[in-house]
C-alpha cells in the first residue's frame, strides 16, 4: 500500500480496450519524466464487475425512489401483478437502453435510468384523478404521502393509472426519438453557452434535495454513516493505492501498478457495509408499496401487452410532451457533463442526436413493457463517475447486461428493494452534490464578473426553483377548463431543469453580449468552448474518436437517407482541424476538488471502442 497525498493519480478511460490508467503527477519542466507511464491493456474483469455493480446500486436507488413515490401517489388499492415484476421491467428497459447508448448512441459511458423528469409529469397525471391524495398543505416536495382517509375512495384502479402513465412514456419516447432524428441538438448547441448549461446543472443538483432528505429522515444515523463513509473513501482515502492487479507498462516489463481502490469503490464499500449493518439490526425492511404479496418468479420474460397495453389519452399525450422536453434537456446536460468529467471534447451534434434517438427508443420499449418510467441519462450515475474519477465503456456494457439479467429475474430485482431507504437517500445525496459542484465550476468558462452574466445566472436558478415550489404550494391550481392543457402546463412549470435551461437559453440569446463574455470564444459552438480551445490538436483528435460510430455501422452511413445524415459524423470533423498552440500542462483538471494538469500522454489514450 502506498499513499501520495500531494498528487493523487486521476483515473480515466484509456485505450481501445477501456483500461483505467493512473495519470502521472504534473512535471511542467520535463513532461517526459513522469513517474507513471500510460498503461495499456484491458480492464480486469473483476474490477469491471465491481465498478458495474456500483452503477447498478445507484440505478437501483433511482428506480426504487421513482416507483415508490409514484405508487404512493395512487389511490388505495393494489396491482394485479407483483411490484417486483414492474421493477424488473424497468431494469430490462434501462439495461437495453444502456447497451444501445454506449454502443451506437452518444458512445459515452452513460447509464440509462429514470429521473425526476419522468416522475414529475407522472405524479401530475395521477394527481388529476386524485386531487387530495398527494397534496399536503405547506409542503413543496413530492411527499411520500398516501391518502388513506374516507374522502379518498373510488378514484380509479392502480392498473388504469399506470396504463395512462405508460402511454405518456411511449409518447415521450416517440417525441424524443423524433427530435434526435431531426438533428435538434445541432440546431440548439450553437446558441448554448456555459450560461445555459451551468444553471441547469446547478438546478439538477438542487432539485432532488427534498426527496433525498425525505428518505434520509427514515433513519438519520444510517444515512449519515453512508455519507461519511463515501466522503472518507472518495476524498480522504482517495490517494491510498494498493497493488491489486497486474498491468503492463509502456515498456516491455510487467509490473503491479497500484490503484486507488477506496476511491474506485467509494460507493460499493459504504453501501455494502451499511446494508449489512442494517440487516443485523433488523432495519432492512421492504417498503409496503414495493413488497409483493406472493413470491416473485425467478425467471420471467418481459414482453409488451402482458399487463394490458399503454393507454393513449389526450392527458397522456400532454404528459408525454412534458416528459420529452424535460428529459431531452436533462440528457444534453448529462452528455456535456460526462464528457467534461472524462476530459473529452464536448460531444458533437451527431453524437447527441444519436443519443436522444436511442433514449427515445428505450422509453418506447419501457412504455410498451408496462413500465411507468422512461429511460434517460442519469445525473446520479454521472455524479458517480465524477466521484470515482473514472469512466469506461466496458463497465457501461456490463451495467447494461446486469440490468437485463435483473429484468429477466424479478426475484433478484426484488432483492434490491431491501436496500434501506436512508442508504438510498445517502447515495443520491452525495452523487447529486457532485453534479451541483460541477455546475458551479462551469461558470468560470464565461465572464462571471459581467453584470449581464450575473443576472442570467441568478435569475435562471432562482426562478427554476421558485416556480415549482409555488405551484406545489398553491392552495388552488390554475384551471383552463381542459384537463390535457392543465396537465401540460402544470408538468412543464414544475420541471426545475427544464425551467433553468429554458430561461437561461432565452436570456442568453436575447440579452446583448460579446462572444468572449458568453464563453463562446473562437467560434466553437459548444457549452465548453474555452476548454476545447485550450486542448492541443493531436490529443483532441484522438479523444474525439470516442464519439464516432463503430466501424461496421460507420460503413453504413453512406446508405442512410439524407434527412438522417445528422446521425453520422462528417467525413472531416471541423473540430479536429482546429488546433491549439498551448502546451499539455495548460489543460487543467476539471474534476471537482482537483487542480492537476492533464498530460498529453493520457489524452492520447482515448479511442473509440470498436
From Swiss-Prot:
Gene Ontology MF terms in the entry: transmembrane transporter activity
Region (Disordered): 1-32, 571-610
Lineage, highest ranks first: Eukaryota, Metazoa, Chordata, Craniata, Vertebrata
Chain intervals with Acidic residues compositional bias: 573-588
Compositional bias annotation for Basic and acidic residues: 601-610
Main location: membrane
Origin superkingdom: Eukaryota
Transmembrane domains' residue ranges: 50-70, 86-106, 165-185, 188-208, 212-232, 267-287, 317-337, 356-376, 395-414, 424-446, 453-472, 487-507
Protein function: Acts as a sodium-dependent hypoxanthine transporter. May show xanthine-hypoxanthine exchange activity.
Protein name in UniProt: Solute carrier family 23 member 3
GO CC annotation: membrane
Pfam families xrefs: Xan_ur_permease (PF00860)
Keyword line: Membrane, Transmembrane, Transmembrane helix
GO biological process: hypoxanthine transport
Intervals, Extracellular compartment: 71-85, 186-187, 233-266, 338-355, 415-423, 473-486
Record's bilayer topology term: Multi-pass membrane protein
Signal sequence region: none
InterPro entries: NCS2 (IPR006043)
Compartments it resides in: Membrane
Protein encoded by which gene: SLC23A3
Comp. bias regions, Polar residues: 1-16
Amino acid at each position: 500500500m502506498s499513499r501520495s497525498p500531494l498528487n493523487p493519480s486521476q483515473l480515466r478511460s484509456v485505450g481501445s480496450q477501456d483500461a483505467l490508467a493512473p495519470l502521472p503527477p504534473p512535471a511542467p519542466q520535463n513532461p517526459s519524466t513522469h513517474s507513471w507511464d500510460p498503461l495499456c491493456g484491458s480492464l480486469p474483469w473483476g474490477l469491471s464487475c465491481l465498478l458495474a455493480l456500483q452503477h447498478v446500486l445507484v440505478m437501483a436507488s433511482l428506480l426504487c425512489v421513482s416507483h415508490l413515490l409514484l405508487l404512493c401517489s395512487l389511490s388505495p388499492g393494489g396491482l394485479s401483478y407483483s411490484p417486483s415484476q414492474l421493477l424488473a421491467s424497468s431494469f430490462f428497459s434501462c439495461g437495453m437502453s444502456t447497451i444501445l447508448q454506449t454502443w451506437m448512441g452518444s458512445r459515452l459511458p452513460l447509464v440509462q435510468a429514470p429521473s425526476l423528469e419522468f416522475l414529475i409529469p407522472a405524479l401530475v397525471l395521477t394527481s388529476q384523478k386524485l386531487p387530495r391524495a398527494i397534496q399536503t398543505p405547506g409542503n413543496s416536495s413530492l411527499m411520500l404521502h398516501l391518502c388513506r382517509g374516507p374522502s379518498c375512495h373510488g378514484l380509479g384502479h392502480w392498473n388504469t393509472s399506470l396504463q395512462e402513465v405508460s402511454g405518456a412514456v411511449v409518447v415521450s419516447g416517440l417525441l424524443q426519438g423524433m427530435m434526435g432524428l431531426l438533428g435538434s441538438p445541432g440546431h440548439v448547441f450553437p446558441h448554448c453557452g456555459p450560461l445555459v448549461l451551468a444553471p441547469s446543472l446547478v438546478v439538477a443538483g438542487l432539485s432532488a434535495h427534498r426527496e433525498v432528505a425525505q428518505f434520509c429522515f427514515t433513519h438519520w444515523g444510517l444515512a449519515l454513516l453512508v455519507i461519511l463513509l463515501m466522503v472518507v473513501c472518495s476524498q480522504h482515502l482517495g490517494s491510498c493505492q494498493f497493488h491489486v492487479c497486474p498491468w503492463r507498462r509502456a515498456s516491455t516489463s510487467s509490473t503491479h501498478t497500484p490503484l486507488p481502490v477506496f476511491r474506485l469503490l467509494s460507493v460499493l464499500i459504504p453501501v455494502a457495509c451499511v446494508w449489512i449493518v442494517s440487516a443485523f439490526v433488523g432495519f432492512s425492511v421492504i417498503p409496503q408499496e414495493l413488497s409483493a404479496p406472493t413470491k416473485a418468479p425467478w425467471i420471467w420474460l418481459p414482453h409488451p401487452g402482458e399487463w394490458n397495453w399503454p393507454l393513449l389519452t389526450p392527458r397522456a399525450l400532454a404528459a408525454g410532451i412534458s416528459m420529452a422536453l424535460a428529459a431531452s434537456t436533462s440528457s444534453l446536460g448529462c452528455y456535456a457533463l460526462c464528457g467534461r468529467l472524462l476530459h473529452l471534447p464536448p460531444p458533437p451534434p451527431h453524437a447527441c442526436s444519436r443519443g436522444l434517438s436511442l433514449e427515445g427508443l428505450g422509453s418506447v420499449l419501457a412504455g410498451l413493457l408496462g413500465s411507468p418510467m422512461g429511460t434517460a441519462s442519469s445525473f446520479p450515475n454521472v455524479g458517480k463517475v465524477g466521484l470515482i474519477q473514472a469512466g469506461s465503456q466496458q463497465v457501461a456494457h456490463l451495467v447494461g447486461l446486469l440490468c437485463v439479467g435483473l429484468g429477466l429475474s424479478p426475484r433478484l430485482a426484488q432483492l434490491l428493494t431491501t436496500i434501506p431507504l436512508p442508504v438510498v437517500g445517502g447515495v443520491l445525496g452525495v452523487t447529486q452534490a457532485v453534479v451541483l459542484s460541477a455546475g458551479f465550476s462551469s461558470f468560470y468558462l464565461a465572464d462571471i464578473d459581467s453584470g449581464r452574466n450575473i443576472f442570467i445566472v441568478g435569475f435562471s436558478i432562482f426562478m427554476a426553483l421558485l416556480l415549482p415550489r409555488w405551484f406545489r404550494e398553491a392552495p388552488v391550481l390554475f384551471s383552463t377548463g381542459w384537463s390535457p392543457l392543465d396537465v401540460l402546463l402544470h408538468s412543464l412549470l414544475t420541471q426545475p431543469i427544464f425551467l433553468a435551461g429554458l430561461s437561461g437559453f432565452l436570456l442568453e440569446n436575447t440579452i446583448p453580449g460579446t462572444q468572449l463574455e458568453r464563453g463562446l470564444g473562437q467560434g466553437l459552438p459548444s457549452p465548453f468552448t474555452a476548454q476545447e480551445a485550450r486542448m492541443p490538436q493531436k490529443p483532441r483528435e484522438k479523444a474525439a474518436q470516442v464519439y464516432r460510430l463503430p466501424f461496421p455501422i460507420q460503413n453504413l452511413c453512406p446508405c442512410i437517407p439524407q434527412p438522417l445524415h445528422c446521425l453520422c459524423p462528417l467525413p472531416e470533423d471541423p473540430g479536429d482541424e482546429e488546433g491549439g498552440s498551448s502546451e499539455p500542462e495548460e489543460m487543467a483538471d476539471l474534476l471537482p476538488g482537483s487542480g492537476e494538469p492533464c498530460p498529453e500522454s493520457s489524452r492520447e489514450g482515448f479511442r473509440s471502442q470498436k
